[in-house]
């Protein structure tokens, strides 16, 4: 593998990463091969081994690329959220906009959702993917904490992870069962717990008390 030290080399490297990310979305990990990536990027076959140490390295970069695009979209969504007190339903819908998407009945959105969970499951077997997924998950949790703060709610780190786990479990089960709208069972699960794991801020709570509530184990 040769580092892409020139502008042309960097463009080629990014083209290969983007091509691999497209193939991941369309066909999963089995679709990502040296030849298919080079063909999609319209580059010589040897370029995949020239710019990347291995196919696993290329896949890891593609996963990071896809995750970064999703996180950028989530940041834009969070940036649109005003800071005000929200009820249970409104808060749950905001959380699901980030974790599931606003419209899971759309075929493209459903494909992206499936690809996201495929990447998560694959990281259990591949250390290079695990590191990428953990970095992406940390950023996702920060965005979730932000949107909950903007909804005038308080959440501790371990409770935030519990919230994500409930959504993950509901969505994966719905996808396995062929549910046309995975967001619906995830919403039902969150409605039962959101006020417990991320309760509304108590009126007149002092800043020190609020920070302690967020950090308390």
Ranges and model annotations:
Residues 5-6:
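Short Lys/Arg-rich basic patches
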Residues 12-15, 19, 159:
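N-terminal positioning helix adjacent to the helix-turn-helix/winged-helix DNA-binding module
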Residues 15, 23-61:
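Helix-turn-helix
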Residues 64-70:
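Short, basic, alpha-helical segments at the C-terminal edge of helix-turn-helix-like DNA-binding modules
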Residues 72-113, 160-163, 187:
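Hydrophobic alpha-helical connector segments
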Residues 122-127:
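Short loop-to-helix capping motifs
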Residues 129-130, 134, 149-213, 217:
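Hydrophobic/aromatic-rich alpha-helical bundle segments in the mid-to-C-terminal region
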Residues 132-139, 143:
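Short, solvent-exposed amphipathic helices
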């Amino acid at each position: 593998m040769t580092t892409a030290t020139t502008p042309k080399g960097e463009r080629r490297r990014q083209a290969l990463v983007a091509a691999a990310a497209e193939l991941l979305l369309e066909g999963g990990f089995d679709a990502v091969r040296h030849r298919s990536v080079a063909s999609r990027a319209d580059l010589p076959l040897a370029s995949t081994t020239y710019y990347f140490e291995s196919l696993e390295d290329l896949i890891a970069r593609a996963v990071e690329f896809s995750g970064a695009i999703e996180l950028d979209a989530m940041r834009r969504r969070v940036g649109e959220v005003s800071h005000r007190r929200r009820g249970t339903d409104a808060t749950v819908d905001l959380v699901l906009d980030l974790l599931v998407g606003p419209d899971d009945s759309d075929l493209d959105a459903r494909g992206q959702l499936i690809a996201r969970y495929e990447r998560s499951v694959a990281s259990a077997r591949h250390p290079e993917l695990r590191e990428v997924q953990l970095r992406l998950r940390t950023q996702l949790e920060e965005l979730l904490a932000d949107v909950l703060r903007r909804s005038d709610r308080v959440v501790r780190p371990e409770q935030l992870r519990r919230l994500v786990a409930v959504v993950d479990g509901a969505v994966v089960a719905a996808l396995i069962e062929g549910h046309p709208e995975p967001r619906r069972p995830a919403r039902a699960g969150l409605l039962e717990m959101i006020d417990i794991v991320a309760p509304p801020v108590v009126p007149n709570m002092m800043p020190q008390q609020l920070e302690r509530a967020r950090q308390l184990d």
